[in-house]
Amino acid sequence: QIGSKTVSSLRKTDIKRFYNYLADERHLKPATIDNIHTVLHQILDMAVDDDYIRNNPSNNVLKELKQSHCFQTEKRRALTKPEQELFLDYLKNSPTSKYWYPVFAVMIGTGLRVGEVTGLRWCDIDLEEGIIDVNHTLVYYDHRTEGSKRGCYFNVNTTKTPAGRRKVPMLGFVKEAFLMEKERQELLDLHCEATVDGYTDFIFINRFGQPQHQATLNKAIRRIIRDCNDEQLLKDENAEVLL
């Protein structure tokens, strides 16, 4: 498979063969292959940025796989406005979960991808003008296949496309979320201790001063939704749960 190849020797046919193997022999679900593609595509984008390859060989491969296998795309339902308000209100007032309010408020209020939010630095936001400068993504993946002994660690993926580099306006509650996070870190004397590819001073950090990553946020949101649903059900047996 592709693990034995160098990045410069990878071709689109190699990626196609790998995805077909995952679907036909490993019988992985489309959503799982989609997740693998997300990571692989970002890694190869970084290889393009570093001039190891000229083009990303994974471009459009997932789309072609879905068409050839007649995969049904799983429709993801966005939270309704009442659900968003319920979710954020619960976070803001929960003694055990309010720590997560700022990062999820920013996600909901901006529509940014997880890696774009976790990659935000204080210099990327203008609180006075209410503008967020989105210019890179924070990526966390396993480097051991590249010969590194360090295993999983972060990289910054800069994008050259207009869609990837953009200015996003802050809603009022998004600005409030940034200020809450700033105040919390000042109160706890927390500082970013990480430097990733020359980038530092990340906004959303854990208690060790390291950037948050997707796996941690996924676990947190599942726990929050479970607790939020339980609390609503206790208040009203006929209440509809969040998800």
PLM segments and residue spans:
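N-terminal core-binding DNA-recognition domain of tyrosine site-specific recombinases/integrases
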Residues: 1-50, 95-98, 211-217, 236-243
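Generic recognition of well-ordered alpha-helical segments
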Residues: 17, 38, 42, 89, ...
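Basic, Lys/Arg- and aromatic-enriched nucleic-acid-binding interface segment
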Residues: 30, 34-38, 49, 53-55, ...
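Arg/Lys-rich amphipathic alpha helix in sigma70-family domain 2
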Residues: 45-54, 180-183
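Conserved tyrosine-mediated DNA breakage-rejoining catalytic core shared by Y-recombinases
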Residues: 60-66, 83, 119-194, 198-199
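Short, basic (Lys/Arg/His-rich) helix/loop patches that form interaction surfaces
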Residues: 89-100, 110, 168, 184-194, ...
